[in-house]
From Swiss-Prot:
The keyword Membrane applies. This is Galactan 5-O-arabinofuranosyltransferase. GO terms for biological process: capsule polysaccharide biosynthetic process; cell wall macromolecule biosynthetic process; cell wall organization; mycolate cell wall layer assembly. It comes from Mycobacterium tuberculosis (strain ATCC 25618 / H37Rv). Its main location: membrane. It holds the Pfam family AftA_N. Keywords: Cell membrane, Cell wall biogenesis/degradation, Glycosyltransferase, Membrane, Transferase, Transmembrane, Transmembrane helix. Involved in the biosynthesis of the arabinogalactan (AG) region of the mycolylarabinogalactan-peptidoglycan (mAGP) complex, an essential component of the mycobacterial cell wall. It is not able to add an Araf residue to a terminal Galf. It catalyses: Adds an alpha-D-arabinofuranosyl group from trans,octacis-decaprenylphospho-beta-D-arabinofuranose at the 5-O-position of the eighth, tenth and twelfth galactofuranose unit of the galactofuranan chain of [beta-D-galactofuranosyl-(1->5)-beta-D-galactofuranosyl-(1->6)]14-beta-D-galactofuranosyl-(1->5)-beta-D-galactofuranosyl-(1->4)-alpha-L-rhamnopyranosyl-(1->3)-N-acetyl-alpha-D-glucosaminyl-diphospho-trans,octacis-decaprenol. Not inhibited by the anti-tuberculosis drug ethambutol (EMB). Belongs to the glycosyltransferase 85 family. Residues 466-643 are extracellular. It is a multi-pass membrane protein.
Length: 643
C-alpha cells in the first residue's frame, strides 16, 4: 500500500505531481517542456555531426563501436560529476541542465554512432520495419489519419509516433524512410529526458540520474528496435510510481498525479496498443488493491481510489479517442475480420514465464537486487509498491496470455519482457542506493567504493549494447536504402530498381502516388513510396477492416483465369478499389508470381508463405502496359481502361 514511512532515498515524496498547487504544476510542466527541447537539440546536433563524416560500416570495422564506448564513458562520467555537484549544493540549475544534456547524449551516442554509416535504422527495411517505414511514409505524404496500406480506411495501428515523425519529414523535405533513423533516436532521447524530469520531481536528483540512466541503458539494449514502444517502456516506471501515489492519496491531495496518469495513458493509447493495455491493467490492479485495503476504514475510503481510477480512465479515453474514434466508428458499421489478428503469435518466449533476476549476468544481478528490494520495501515505500505491482502485472498478463490460447488468441506477453527488465532495473537502482546508504554508516569509504563499482558496471553494460543489437545493426547495413545504396558499400539488392519503377508508374498513370493502388509482394516498395497497397505484408499487420482473408481469396482466384477479359472483369467486380499496378516477378511456364502470406496460428511460425501464379496472358493486352525492370515485371492498367 502507499507509503506511511518513507524509505531513505525517497526524498520530497511526489513533489509537485501529487500537489494541486498551480505554481508547482506549472514549474513541472515547464521542466518537461525544457527536457523535450534539450533532447531534440542534443539529438539534432549530434546526428548532424555524425552524418558529416564518412565512417566505415559497423559490421566490418570496430571503429564505430570504439567511438560509441568513448561517448558512453564520457556521458556516464559526466553524470557522476553532475551528481557530485548537486550533492554539494553547487550550480543546481546548471546541474539539471547538464543532466538533461548528458542522458540525451547517452541515448544518441549509443544508437547514433553504431548507425553512423547507414541511413537505415535498426533492422533496416526488413520484416516488421517494412510496415513501420510504410506507415511513416504514409503519414509523411498526408497529415490525415489514414491506414498505412489500404485506401479509404482509418488507421488501426496507433499513429502517434508515425504522425509526428511524418510531419517532421514533410517539414524538412526529408524522405520518410530516411527520417526513420533520426526520428527514432530523437524520440527515445526525448523519452529519457522526460523520464529524468519525472524522477527528479519525485526523488533526490542524484538518485534520479542513477535510475534514469540504468533504465535507459536497458531500454536501448532490448526495446530500441521498436522506438515508440521503447519510449513508453522507459516512462512506465516513473509513471507507475506517480499513479500509485495519486490513487493512494487522500482528501484533496494527489489529483495532479491522477491527471498526469490519465494523460500518460491517453498518450500511450495513441502510441502503442499493447503497452497502454498493460498500463491500464496495472492501474486497475492498483486501484483494486487500494480499495480492498481500505474496506476496514469504511465504504467512502474504499471507493475513493476507484473514483480516481474513473478520472484516469476518462482522461485517457478522451485523449485516445483522437486516434481511435475513426476506426471504432467505421468498425461499428462495416465488417471486421479477425483472421490474422496481431494477437495470433505465440513464440517460445510467450509460452513460458521469464525470470531475468535469475540470469547469470550483470543484468541478472541488478534485477535480482531489485527483486529483493521490492520484497523488502513494497509495503513501506511508494516506489517499491508501484514497481512491485508493475512486475506482478507483467506475470499476471503473461499467464492470462497463455490462457487466451484456448480462445485461439494471445495477449502478446513476450513483448513485455523489456518492460519487465526495465521495472526490475529501476528497482535494482533503488536497492543499490539503499544498500550503499546502509553500509555507508559503517565507514566513509563505502560510498566512493560503491560509486566506482556502479560506474564500472554501467560502463560494462553500456558498451555491450552494440553487441546485443549486432544482428539488427548488420541488417541496417546490408539492406538497400531508398537511394539504391547499402551502408556497407557492397552491391545493392533489387531495391535499386525502385526509382525506375516509380518513374514508370507515374509516367503511365499520370497520377499522384496517393491515387494509385499497387498489388505486389515486394512490400518494401510501399515503404519507400506512398502508393496504396491492395494487400498487406502479413495478415497480422493488416487493418481488420481490410478483410485480408477475402482479398487473399480473390487474388488466389485469379490464378485460374486465362484471358485479359476475364481478368479485367474480375478486377471491376471487386468490392474494394482494384489495383491498377502489378509489381511481380517472373515465374515458370509463362507466368508472373506473387509471394503472399497466410495466417496459420497457433503453429509457429505463425505465417505460411505461398505463391500465386498469374498467366502472362492476363496482361498480354493493349489495355495493359507491361515492362521488365531488373528482376521485376511491372504491369500497369492504362488509365482510360481503369477509369
Amino acid at each position: 500500500m502507499p507509503s506511511r514511512r518513507k524509505s531513505p532515498q525517497f526524498g520530497h515524496e511526489m513533489g509537485a505531481f501529487t500537489s494541486a498547487r498551480a505554481r508547482e504544476v506549472l514549474v513541472a510542466l515547464g521542466q518537461l517542456a525544457a527536457a523535450v527541447v534539450v533532447a531534440v537539440g542534443v539529438a539534432v546536433v549530434s546526428l548532424l555531426a555524425i552524418a558529416r563524416v564518412e565512417w566505415p560500416a559497423f559490421p566490418s570495422s570496430n571503429q564505430l563501436h570504439a567511438l560509441t564506448t568513448v561517448g558512453q564513458v564520457g556521458c556516464l562520467a559526466g553524470l557522476v560529476g553532475i551528481g557530485w555537484l548537486w550533492r554539494h549544493g553547487r550550480f543546481r540549475r546548471l546541474a539539471r541542465l547538464g543532466g538533461l544534456v548528458l542522458v540525451s547524449a547517452f541515448t544518441v551516442v549509443t544508437l547514433g554512432m553504431p548507425l553512423g554509416a547507414t541511413k537505415l535504422y535498426l533492422f533496416g527495411i526488413s520484416v516488421d520495419q517494412q510496415f513501420r517505414t510504410e506507415y511513416l511514409t504514409r503519414l509523411t505524404d498526408t497529415a490525415a489519419l489514414r491506414d498505412m496500406t489500404y485506401i479509404g480506411l482509418p488507421p488501426f495501428y496507433p499513429p502517434g509516433w508515425f504522425w509526428i515523425g511524418g510531419r517532421a519529414a514533410a517539414l524538412t523535405g526529408t524522405p520518410a524512410w530516411e527520417m526513420f533513423k533520426p526520428w527514432a533516436i530523437t524520440s527515445m532521447a526525448i523519452a529519457v529526458a522526460v523520464a529524468l524530469v519525472l524522477w527528479w520531481r519525485m526523488i533526490r536528483f542524484e538518485y534520479a540520474l542513477l535510475v534514469t540512466v540504468a533504465t535507459a541503458a536497458v531500454m536501448l539494449a532490448y526495446s530500441s528496435p521498436e522506438p515508440y514502444a521503447a519510449m513508453i517502456t522507459v516512462l512506465l516506471p516513473p509513471m507507475l510510481v506517480l499513479t500509485w501515489s495519486g490513487l493512494g492519496a487522500r482528501d484533496r491531495q494527489g489529483w495532479a498525479a491522477v491527471v498526469g496518469a490519465g494523460v500518460f495513458l491517453g498518450f500511450a493509447a495513441t502510441w502503442y496498443t499493447l503497452l497502454v493495455a498493460y498500463g491500464a491493467f496495472t492501474v486497475v490492479l492498483m486501484a483494486l488493491l487500494l480499495a480492498g485495503s481500505r474496506l476496514q476504514s469504511g465504504i467512502k475510503a474504499a471507493v475513493d481510489p476507484l473514483c480516481r481510477l474513473a478520472v484516469v480512465g476518462a482522461i485517457a479515453a478522451a485523449i485516445g479517442s483522437t486516434t481511435w474514434l475513426p476506426y471504432l466508428l467505421r468498425a461499428a458499421r462495416d465488417p471486421v475480420s479477425d483472421t490474422g489478428s496481431a494477437q495470433h503469435y505465440l513464440p517460445a518466449d510467450g509460452a513460458a514465464l521469464t525470470f531475468p533476476m535469475l540470469q547469470f549476468s550483470l543484468l541478472g544481478a541488478i534485477c535480482l537486487l531489485g527483486t529483493l528490494w521490492l520484497v523488502m520495501r513494497a509495503r513501506s515505500s511508494a516506489p517499491a509498491g508501484a514497481l512491485a505491482i508493475g512486475v506482478l502485472a507483467v506475470y499476471l498478463w503473461s499467464l492470462l496470455s497463455m490462457l487466451a490460447t484456448l480462445a485461439r488468441t494471445t495477449l502478446l506477453s513476450f513483448r513485455l519482457q523489456p518492460t519487465l527488465s526495465v521495472l526490475l532495473v529501476a528497482a535494482g537502482a533503488f536497492g543499490f542506493v539503499e544498500a550503499v546508504q546502509a553500509l555507508g554508516k559503517r565507514g566513509r569509504g563505502v560510498i566512493p567504493m560503491a560509486a566506482a563499482i556502479g560506474l564500472a558496471g554501467a560502463i560494462a553494460f553500456s558498451q555491450d549494447i552494440p553487441d546485443v543489437l549486432r544482428p539488427d545493426l548488420t541488417i541496417a547495413y546490408t539492406d538497400t536504402d531508398g537511394y539504391g545504396q547499402r551502408g556497407d558499400r557492397r552491391p545493392p539488392g533489387s531495391e535499386k530498381y525502385y526509382p525506375a519503377i516509380d518513374a514508370a508508374i507515374r509516367r503511365v498513370t499520370g497520377k499522384r502516388r496517393d491515387r494509385t493502388v499497387v498489388l505486389t509482394a515486394d512490400y518494401s516498395f510501399l515503404s519507400y513510396y506512398p502508393y496504396w497497397g491492395f494487400q498487406g505484408l502479413t495478415p497480422h499487420y493488416a487493418n481488420p477492416l481490410a478483410q485480408f482473408d477475402k482479398r487473399a481469396t480473390q487474388i488466389d482466384s485469379w490464378s485460374g483465369l486465362s484471358t485479359a477479359d476475364e481478368f479485367i472483369a474480375a478486377l471491376d467486380k471487386l468490392p474494394w478499389q482494384p489495383p491498377t499496378v502489378f509489381l511481380m516477378r517472373h515465374g515458370a511456364h509463362n507466368s508472373y508470381t506473387l509471394r503472399l502470406a497466410q495466417d496459420v496460428y497457433p503453429n509457429q511460425p505463425n505465417v505460411r508463405r505461398y505463391t500465386v501464379d498469374l498467366r502472362t496472358a492476363l496482361f498480354a493486352d493493349p489495355r495493359f502496359v507491361v515492362e521488365d525492370i531488373g528482376p521485376f515485371v511491372l504491369a500497369i492498367r492504362k488509365p482510360q481502361e481503369s477509369a
